[in-house]
A protein has these predicted regions:
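N-terminal intrinsically disordered, cationic/polar leader segments
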Residues: 1-51, 55, 66-92
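Acidic, glycine-enriched active-site microenvironments
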Residues: 60
């Protein structure tokens, strides 16, 4: 009989938010992919992921504990700043 698949990380809101943020950072070229490869800048994907985080922040307002609210707020803000910086770097 096959062994059940075990999750690598806990399945909770903070882990999901961190996963989205990490993927956005990879798309922005701010961190390597999980295999260590440096991927090309992908502003479209980064913007989409940042927009998803912003939507989650709005839709979950009042339903998160303090640490979850601080996490999503700070990550969304930092990613928006990084996105603007990346846009400026590619247009100039």
């Amino acid at each position: 009989m096959a062994e059940p698949v075990q999750s690598l990380h806990p399945v909770d809101f903070s882990t999901h938010v961190l996963s989205l943020a990490s993927t956005a950072l990879i798309a922005l070229g701010k961190m390597p992919a999980p295999d260590g490869e440096d991927l090309p800048l992908d502003l479209e994907t980064a913007k989409h992921l940042i927009d998803v985080l912003g939507m989650l922040e709005q839709k979950t307002k009042g339903n998160l504990d303090e640490s979850e609210q601080k996490l999503i707020s700070s990550l969304t803000y930092d990613l928006r700043v990084a996105f603007v910086d990346a846009q400026k770097a590619t247009s100039g």
